[in-house]
Amino acid sequence: MKEKILLVDGYNMIAFWQETRQLFKKSELDAARTILLEKLSHYASFEGIRVICVFDAQYMPGIRQTYEEFQVQVVFTAEEETADDYIERLAAELNTPLHQVSVATSDLNEQWTVFAQGALRVS
């Protein structure tokens, strides 16, 4: 059985979710990220999947960071790297017979790129 992995474009999701959109607009990013990660944790537990949530460094400059919070793998990209770039590369790496990769983003260009790599879209 394939391991199901969901890759999430964190700030894209925050900007479009009604529950977090106002926090994003007010630059209350810590609160918005916490809400998103809690929701993703519940979703991961319910679905029995691994979730990797990627945030652009443009909102949190510095070196790439990876850690786990609420049972979700959290990645802040390197300063010159977008979440889209990271997700595209990771989707290609994880697209093996052992994994079923899905991507959650509203970015159409990102969707087409990951479709071409064999990943699925979650909306």
PLM feature spans:
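Nuclease catalytic cores that cleave nucleic-acid phosphodiester bonds
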Residues: 3-8, 12-123
